[in-house]
Amino acid sequence: MNNFKRVFLIVMDSVGIGEAPDARDFNDVGANTLGHIAENMNGLNMPTMASLGLSNIRKIEGIEASAQPRAHYTKMQEASNGKDTMTGHWEIMGLHIEKPFRTFPDGFPDELIEELEQKTGRKVIGNKPASGTEILDELGQQHMDTGSLIVYTSADSVLQIAAHEEIIPIDEQYRICEIARELTLDEKYMVGRVIARPFIGEPGAFERTSNRHDYALKPFGRTVMNELKDNNYDVLALGKISDIYDGEGVTESIRTKDNNDGMVQLRKSMDKSFTGLNFLNLVDFDAKYGHRRDPVGYGKALEEFDEQLPEIIEQLHDDDLLIITADHGNDPIHHGTDHTREYVPLVVYHNQIKQAKELPIRKTFADIGATIADNFGIKLPEHGESFLNDIK
C-alpha cells in the first residue's frame, strides 16, 4: 500500500500502562496508571480501545483482551531523563532530553523570588504548589489589597503568576511574565513554562479569564514538526500542542476547552483537506484527575474518550493513519501528586489492516516521530526508529 496522506496523533496525557524498567530511579516502583484506575473502578468499560488491542498490551481489569485486535499495538519506554509533558512530547517528535526540567515541590528558591520582586517592583505571595482555583480563594483578597503577585507551581515544571485584571493590567501581567521567563532560563532554575493566569471577579467568585498566556521554552533542537512545516506539509496542533512546542513547526493551532471539546475539534478538523499531521493532546486526564489523585474521575474520563472514539475511526479515509499514545504516567493511586515513570500504550490503526499484530516494544517515544518522518519522506530525526513498514 501507499504511504498515508494524513496522520492523526492523539496523546492521552498521562495514561501510563505500568512501571518503566527505570521506575526506581524516579521513585515510581509499582506505578500503573491504567491498571490501578481499572482496579479502583472494579473494571473499566472501554470497548473501543479493547477492540484496538489495549488490553493485549497488558491485562486491564474490565477490558477484554481481543482475540482479533483491529489495530497494531505495543508499549513504549521513555528514553529521556524526565517524566513531564514537555519531555514526553518533545521525545515523541524526535528529541532526546538529557537534563530534566526542574520541578519545585517546595516552591521556588528565595534567590529567584527576590530577583522577581526586585525587577517587577511587586512583592510575591504564595510560592508553593497549588491548584489554580484554590490559591485564588486563599490569596485573591490579599492580592487585591496589596497588589502582590500570586506565584505558584504544580507537579509540572511551571511557574504560574496569577493577578486580577483590575489590579494589574494585562500588559503589565505579560511584562512581569516575560521577566520571570528571562530569569528562569538560568540553568539552575530551568523551568519548562511560565504562565500568566489573569482573573477577574470578587472574593468567593473569582474567575480565570481567557487571557492566559504561556511562555514556553523552544524545543532544544529541530523536531519532525519543523521538518514537516519546512517541506510544506500541514501541522495542525490541537489543545495545548502549540504551547508545548512554543509554536515551532505548527501551521495551524486550534484551542480546546477540555477533553470533550478536543475530540469535537478533532472530528471537525477531519473534514479539512490537508496533507500532514493532526496532533491532539487530551490534558484533562492529567490536569483534572491524575494530579488530583481522583481515580474515579479519571476512569470516567477514559470511558467518555472511548465512547467518542468510534466517530473518529468512522471518519478515517483509507489513506489516513491514527496513532494513540501517551506522554508519561500519572497514577492516581500512587504516592504524592507527581507524574509517574511508566511505559505508555501505542495503538496504531488504519482501514487497510488485514492482520493486526503486536509490534516490538519501543525503546523511545521518538519512534513515532521517525515513523511520521519516514511516511512523508522527510529528514529522519536523530533519535527513533521508524515502524512504518511494520504497520502497512
From Swiss-Prot:
Compartmental location: Cytoplasm
Signal sequence region: none
Pfam families reported for this sequence: Metalloenzyme (PF01676)
Binding site for Mn(2+) 2: D286, H291, H339
Cofactor: Mn(2+)
Superkingdom of this protein's organism: Bacteria
Pathway: Carbohydrate degradation; 2-deoxy-D-ribose 1-phosphate degradation; D-glyceraldehyde 3-phosphate and acetaldehyde from 2-deoxy-alpha-D-ribose 1-phosphate: step 1/2
UniProt keyword annotations, A-Z: Cytoplasm, Isomerase, Manganese, Metal-binding
SUPFAM superfamilies reported in the protein's UniProt record: Alkaline phosphatase-like, DeoB insert domain-like
Catalyzed reactions: 2-deoxy-alpha-D-ribose 1-phosphate = 2-deoxy-D-ribose 5-phosphate; alpha-D-ribose 1-phosphate = D-ribose 5-phosphate
Cofactor annotation comment: Binds 2 manganese ions.
EC nos: 5.4.2.7
Binding site for Mn(2+) 1: D13, D327, H328
Main location: cytoplasm
InterPro entries: Alkaline_phosphatase_core_sf (IPR017850), DeoB (IPR010045), Metalloenzyme (IPR006124), Phosphopentomutase_DeoB_cap_sf (IPR024052)
GO biological-process terms attached to the record: 2-deoxyribose 1-phosphate catabolic process; 5-phosphoribose 1-diphosphate biosynthetic process; metabolic compound salvage; nucleotide metabolic process
Gene Ontology CC annotation, any one: cytosol
Gene3D superfamilies: Alkaline Phosphatase, subunit A, Phosphopentomutase
GO molecular function: magnesium ion binding; manganese ion binding; phosphopentomutase activity
Broad enzyme group: isomerase
Function: Isomerase that catalyzes the conversion of deoxy-ribose 1-phosphate (dRib-1-P) and ribose 1-phosphate (Rib-1-P) to deoxy-ribose 5-phosphate (dRib-5-P) and ribose 5-phosphate (Rib-5-P), respectively.
PANTHER family linked: PHOSPHOPENTOMUTASE (PTHR21110:SF0)
Family, as annotated: Belongs to the phosphopentomutase family.
Name of the protein in its database record: Phosphopentomutase
Organism from which the protein derives: Oceanobacillus iheyensis (strain DSM 14371 / CIP 107618 / JCM 11309 / KCTC 3954 / HTE831)
Gene name as annotated: deoB
